[in-house]
């Protein structure tokens, strides 16, 4: 099948909303409507205020920049599609298709001025068959029929032999996986119910190899505070595969669609922090807005706090609850949510994998930190607050109450800013998150 020829990616996203490419008239109409909505929202200060009501000024600035970038990208998508359709120049559209062989056929059809009906007639098949092929980007077509369509559209197929593990046999793909890591994943997976007790080392090696083929190797492990290379981290592969499998099960339940411009509910999310079961309520609220949150314990040695990526076009946030404290939970959740909202088109398809420790050297991670920090504690309020320098728990707790957030969040912020994790250790909501969320795992 054609899927074995495709450039492997961490996710295959087929929606025009997140892929940034328009391939038919319906997607063109939808994109134009979205541009119109963005233009209206950005047309005046009052329009922006209405859309971002209740959000801190610092967050409003970030959201506004995201909207401007979104509008610019959508206009470029429209230009690429119309240029291919009206002039036959498919260069811009092909650039957006990248090396995806299925999308390349659709681009070629558009550039030749063929409708789906025209192509079906030339192939001697029903129009509905072309519609099905294009709906899944030709994933379901046989190699023989792919070659037939490609020939009709004057698309050349080339085979290149290169030293790339994604094009080698399964044994070569997982040759670097140690027995120790295999045993570690087996122990963890059996304990957590990832797979049955009957799975052996050989089967797990095949599972890991197939996962690398399906998702590819992430070129970077993006951390909340720095960027480090984890392109061959087998523990990350295994954990990510588990998240993706659980996310697909949730997607099958037909959740509401996600809209990065729908942000009016964010203040309500922050207000949930004051509740004892706030983490559980937060996960339900995100699901109501088309964002899946999966709580899955990390494999020992991985040291991951959270992740954000797309699965079948749906945003997924993964949390490990590596540190069982309320302050860490809320900051990690909102950091990943920042990636979903701010970076929906500019990184989420590759994915973000976050650790809470060290110093950020990545622009998108710094943006996510800023978004999460200001959403929880508005920068202007924090700069004027005596709680920043207070040693009295009462002063800090009063500030949190005035803000309408859990005091653990403020105590955690102080510990981090002062780089002193010995203070207020009993004030950050320890041992209160796993108990209510790990039952999901």
Region roles according to the model:
Residues 105, 116, 127, 146, ...:
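Helix-turn-helix DNA-binding elements, focusing on the entry/boundary residues of the two helices
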Residues 113-133:
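Short alpha-helical DNA-recognition segment
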Residues 166-441:
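Active-site hotspot residues in diverse enzymes, especially metal/ion-binding acidic/histidine motifs
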Residues 143-159:
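DNA major-groove recognition helix of helix-turn-helix/homeodomain DNA-binding modules
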Residues 2-98:
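N-terminal flexible/basic segments that precede or flank functional cores
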Residues 103-120, 249-250:
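Short basic helix-loop element that most often maps to the first helix and adjoining turn
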């Amino acid at each position: 099948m054609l899927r074995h020829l495709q450039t492997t990616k961490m996710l295959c996203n087929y929606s025009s909303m997140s892929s940034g490419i328009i391939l038919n008239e319906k997607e063109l109409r939808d994109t134009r409507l979205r541009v119109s909505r963005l233009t209206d929202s950005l047309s005046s200060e009052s329009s922006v205020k209405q859309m971002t009501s209740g959000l801190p000024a610092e967050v409003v600035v970030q959201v506004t920049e995201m909207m401007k970038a979104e509008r610019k990208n959508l206009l470029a998508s429209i230009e690429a599609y119309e240029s291919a359709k009206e002039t036959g120049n498919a260069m811009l559209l092909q650039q957006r298709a990248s090396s995806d062989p299925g999308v390349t056929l659709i681009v070629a059809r558009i550039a030749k001025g063929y409708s789906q009906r025209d192509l079906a007639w030339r192939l001697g098949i029903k129009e509905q068959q072309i519609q099905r092929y294009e709906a899944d980007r030709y994933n379901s077509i046989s190699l023989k029929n792919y070659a037939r369509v490609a020939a009709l559209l004057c698309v050349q197929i080339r085979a290149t032999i290169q030293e790339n593990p994604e094009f080698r046999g399964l044994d070569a793909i997982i040759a670097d996986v140690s027995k120790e890591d295999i045993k570690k994943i087996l122990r963890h997976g059996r304990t957590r119910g990832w797979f049955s007790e009957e799975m052996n080392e050989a089967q797990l090696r095949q599972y890991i190899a197939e996962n690398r083929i399906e998702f590819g190797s992430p070129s970077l492990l993006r951390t909340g505070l720095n960027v480090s290379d984890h392109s061959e981290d087998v523990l990350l592969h295994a954990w990510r595969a588990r998240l993706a499998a659980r996310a697909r099960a949730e997607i099958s339940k037909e959740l509401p669609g996600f809209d990065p411009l729908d942000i009016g509910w964010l203040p309500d999310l922050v207000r949930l922090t004051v509740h004892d079961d706030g983490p559980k309520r937060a996960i339900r609220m995100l699901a109501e807005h088309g964002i899946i949150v999966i709580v899955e314990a990390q494999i020992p040695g991985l040291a991951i706090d959270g992740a954000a990526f797309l699965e079948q076009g749906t945003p997924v946030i993964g949390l490990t609850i590596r540190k069982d404290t309320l302050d860490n939970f809320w900051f990690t959740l909102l950091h990943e949510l920042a990636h979903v909202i701010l970076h929906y088109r500019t990184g989420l398809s590759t994915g973000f994998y976050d650790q809470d420790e060290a110093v950020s050297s990545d622009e998108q991670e710094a943006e996510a930190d800023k978004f999460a920090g200001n959403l929880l504690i508005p920068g202007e309020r924090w700069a004027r607050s005596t709680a920043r320098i207070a040693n009295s728990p009462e002063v800090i707790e009063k500030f949190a109450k005035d803000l309408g957030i859990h005091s653990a969040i403020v105590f955690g912020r102080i510990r981090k800013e002062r780089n002193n994790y010995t203070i207020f250790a009993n004030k950050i909501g320890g041992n209160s998150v796993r108990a209510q969320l790990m039952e999901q795992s």
